[in-house]
């Protein structure tokens, strides 16, 4: 699960003085990455944590203590990761169990890298016991579980004890590349079982992990589970995918004068040239297939892989159209004979001539979030093609990623590719690029800015977040205003970008000042002895894309801290935030987060509280609220009208807030939880409101899943509960939103 490179969902933060006395919010851990985890003495690590309401980070200590004391602090560490979703993936679990049973036929040394809860290690130990009893062998085998992340190691030991496996599996709390034969393990391993795969296949460090294992930890010609992984791709046309990356051409159609991407600077604001994980089935009706699926790379686990590889593919177009993206996925062959497979392919794929592969494809009940398809955007407007035209695709890979480059035989030249990053280039997430290209969003924001600056002369405007759009818009629309941009995430990069686009947007850099460094508080010295008349934010904070919606109330906290430099009649934009919610049917998402019991014969009930599962958790524990793009969560349906839960008034200092609402159900169905988000009221007249709800596909919503699904019905029906009462409270110190509900 996790080995050479740590990679989990990005949590949400809370400034801590000690790990043992504080309760963390869900999503409060920095992305687990070698730079964010530091080893100390044995049984102790540093973990980087971020406070969502200040943007500050701090190293805290996680110690290996008695399990009786570590349950409360550990829950948030792992509840926001993909472990629970992965363990609920029955297709995956079954495939690994069948392959391990088939591969381990005699006593041997098995190494499990990135062992997680120890599921594969226990499968290996059980298979070895069975093989030994069948063969009546007197020799002994061994199973070694290698897991580098201390909270996961502690959880694995609980699971092993619960299943009576603690003496059959040896646990080592190290990275796999730190293991030494003769020091950590007595001999090289005969069999490797491992699952260190992400949606792209390589992103969790599969290649360097296998390289080190073959060099230092495995016998020559070892057996492995999985045996092989093959990546596949398909060319697609999709305007939705195009708008996620090509801001230059999308913006050219805008009716306003703002140019975030001016002519001859087409890549100055763009997405990273990489594959992006996405549930492509959710947009299948917006995709036009332009080719048959094609094989790209094969990676054999049983031999040492190369760090770099390339292949040139000849692909025949099956339709006229424009190639906007390469959609890719992978298929695992888990056994050497080729009878056990697992696929992450989209549901529109079929293998009519290979029933073994056909059975690997996900069905309607097989949705999972830990492995998705991947999308690689074709630069610019895409590549126009004609049916039966032959396309040349050059695919390359390095240690951790796969990339693509097109060349057309007719033209004999490569199409424009992503430029090498420059100092003034901004790399933003696809959803942020799409927001900046959305004509309705731009119109609303510009209308609000025009109203705000109208009649103001030589005013001081303060942009508190990372909004380059607002900064440019104010400077463009108010030539006499002076704009100070804090850019807490973009910093100097944002300043260089503004300088590069200033001429195209009709403003001078004399109008704009980027502080370029984080400051706890601004003083009158920073504002040149002037009071701020306009304080604005979208709000958008660079790098916080995986936060819960209400953690953008950092804007409110920063507005409060800036009170000493605000004019008495200062205009705050947005002026208000409204917490909205609706009841949802989310069967696929709920199944992926449900409590675990038996997994292929092994009791995993010990992990439920720690992983934040939905179900019968001991009081007062409950599953956390987590951020999701609801439209990508498999089957989903709204069961109520949208209702207001709570309001946040930014004209006043940040404070604790409470809200209560009664909701009537509009659909007779099974309710799995509630979606929550914030609508930002931009102007004081309440006439311009920007919603971030489920209908807006570029924002994540917070999802509060129920402990158990509830049957609901409409008013007057006899089919279950007809209404629910929601109570919420917001903690301004931690950024936590507490949610309680009662069905009636």
Predicted regions and their residues:
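Class I SAM-binding transferase module
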Residues: 2, 33-113, 118-744
